[in-house]
Amino acid sequence: MKIIKRNGAEVPFDITKIITAVTKASDSVGGQSRLTREQITQIAAAVTDQCQALNRAVSVEEVQDLVENQLMDIQAHDVARHYIT
């Protein structure tokens, strides 16, 4: 599976980039709003599955939208806000 970067280059999909970005957003929130490692892994896996189901290269923006949707689905509004910014 490929990702289309903002500069138009196609690169291999890397789930660890999602995990890292969501972890950073979660860590910046702190307290009870922080996500568990398991929740972060589940979000990354769900986004990966959604991207694979599209059967095409997806843009970075599409991946970010999917991550945001997953965060909102689990009511992680504070983490979503930090992820977006």
In which residue ranges do the predicted regions lie?
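Long, C-terminal-biased catalytic regions of enzyme "large/alpha" subunits
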Residues: M1-T85
